[in-house]
Design a protein with these regions (language model features):
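Mid-protein regulatory/catalytic core that forms ligand/cofactor-binding pockets
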Residues: 109-222
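Key DNA-contact positions within bacterial/archaeal DNA-binding proteins
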Residues: 42, 98
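Basic amphipathic alpha-helical segments that dock to polyanions
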Residues: 13, 33, 44-54, 190
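Basic, amphipathic "hinge/linker" alpha-helix immediately C-terminal to the N-terminal HTH DNA-binding motif
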Residues: 63-82
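A short, conserved structural fragment
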Residues: 52-62
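Helix-turn-helix DNA-binding elements, focusing on the entry/boundary residues of the two helices
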Residues: 30, 48, 86
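Extreme N-terminal segment that seeds HTH/winged-HTH DNA-binding domains in transcriptional regulators
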Residues: 1-38
Length: 239
């Protein structure tokens, strides 16, 4: 059975299950799949039974959902298609990064493995998509990014640390409007940010993009979407 022999629904479910494990160590459940897809629990439960009967997942009743080796192979292949198509739309056709997710969702089910291989070659074998997500290689290997959400990174700042300098490695593409906001404020993949605490009793952080003078306040939704790596920290004495 090839990837294109799977139904569109099956392809989507496998991709969602894998995606839920990419940046989280939490077990995947029917509930988390329902939340991610917006589908009813009854629909998800029926789909999990079908995937299990096909040997694509292991799912104990009311337990976690795990991909089998075959299921993971198909899931990663779908992720590879999606992220290569996003890269093509941005790099070649001039789409903005907030426009490509839904477009790629529609296209990824219609293309062949041969097309994907030629697209990868045409693009020069990119390792990451426009949002910074790793593009799986043809053999299924996935680059591991040394990055954490800005929310977690800021929470782990040592007491007495005044500033945190980070590089944006990856930005979640789940909210196009948030992507537009990031673009407008210069918060893009590769940007260097200086992070300081927000106002007292506020959950917002303030970040300054390198070479910019004005700080940008970011709430939890925004900081959850930003995945960063540490450049340095500065204490009040050394600031």
């Amino acid at each position: 059975m090839s990837l294109n022999d799977l139904s569109t629904s099956t392809q989507n479910y496998l991709k969602v299950i894998w995606s839920l494990t990419e940046w989280s160590s939490e077990p995947v459940t029917a509930t988390s799949i329902s939340r991610q897809t917006g589908l009813r629990m009854s629909s998800v439960s029926d789909a999990m039974r079908k995937l299990s009967s096909q040997g694509l997942i292991v799912h104990a009743p009311y337990g976690s959902v795990e991909l089998t080796d075959e299921g993971r192979t198909y899931a990663v292949a779908m992720i590879r298609r999606h992220r290569l198509i996003e890269s093509f739309l941005v790099d070649t056709l001039g789409y903005t990064w907030d426009q490509v997710h839904d477009e790629a969702e529609n296209m990824e089910h219609a293309v062949s493995d041969f097309f994907v291989a030629r697209l990868d070659e045409f693009l020069g074998h990119p390792e990451r998509d426009p949002h910074g997500d790793p593009i799986p290689a043809a053999d299924g290997t996935v680059l591991a990014l040394d990055a954490r959400s800005l929310t977690d990174m800021a929470a782990a700042m040592e007491t007495g640390t005044e500033k945190l300098r980070v590089t944006v490695e990856r930005i979640s593409d789940s909210d196009p409007e948030l992507l537009k906001h990031f673009e407008e404020t210069g918060i893009v993949v590769g940007a260097v940010l200086t992070v300081t605490e927000g106002a007292p009793f506020s959950e917002a952080l303030e970040v300054t993009v390198d070479k910019a003078s004005q700080a940008v306040p970011l709430g939890n939704i925004a900081t959850d979407a930003l995945f960063v790596s540490t450049l340095s920290t500065a204490s009040p004495a050394s600031a």
